[in-house]
Regions:
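Conserved non-catalytic scaffold segment of RNase H-like nuclease domains
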Residues: 1-112, 126-148
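Short Asp/Glu-rich motifs
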Residues: 73, 121, 156
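A short, structured active-site edge motif that brings together acidic residues
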Residues: 111-121
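Residues on a specific face of well-ordered alpha-helices
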Residues: 119, 131-135, 155
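Acidic, divalent-metal-coordinating active-site segment for phosphoryl/phosphodiester hydrolysis
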Residues: 149-156
Length: 156
């Protein structure tokens, strides 16, 4: 049986899933070292995005104004991730935040296996001075055109 890896990144209005909301979801599906699918979407957080987050992510309130609410795409995201291995850079944030959003919408938590690319980088690249995604991409010669955009971060 082929393993499908779901490389995920989310952007949020802040770091506390109790009060903050997702504003972007990006996922790249990989099987046998080949990209087999992609899914990304802006998400209307039903709250204002702070200037700090807008500056960091380049995601504006206007951009997400007509985007779907998380509850409208929760089932799609849940189905996409079922039977995959969840891969993220700092998985503890993305996996926890996403699960919190799913439960908030009345969905079950994800219970899939996960891999943290920060931990992998620390093991395989122990001499790096920074494990931020942007810094690692630069160090490895990977072009990262849109940092802090979920689809771009997942692709990198």
């Amino acid at each position: 049986m082929t393993t499908t890896y779901a490389i995920v990144d989310i952007e949020t209005t802040g770091t506390d899933p109790k009060v903050d909301r997702m504003i972007q979801f990006g996922c790249v599906l990989v099987e046998n070292q080949k990209i087999v699918g992609r899914f990304s979407t802006d998400i209307n957080p039903s709250q204002m995005i702070s200037r700090q987050i807008q500056s960091l992510t380049q995601i504006s309130n206007r951009q997400v104004q007509k985007a779907p609410y998380f509850e409208d795409i929760a089932q799609t995201i849940y189905n996409l991730l079922q039977d995959t291995v969840f891969v993220a850079h700092n998985i503890h944030f993305d996996y926890h935040f996403l699960n919190h959003e799913l439960v908030r919408c009345g969905m079950p938590r994800l219970t899939i296996a996960g891999i943290d690319t920060v931990e992998l980088a620390q093991i395989f690249l122990p001499t790096e001075s920074s494990y931020r995604l942007n810094d690692l991409a630069e160090s490895l010669g990977i072009i990262h055109e849109n940092p802090h955009q979920a689809a771009s971060d997942a692709e990198v």
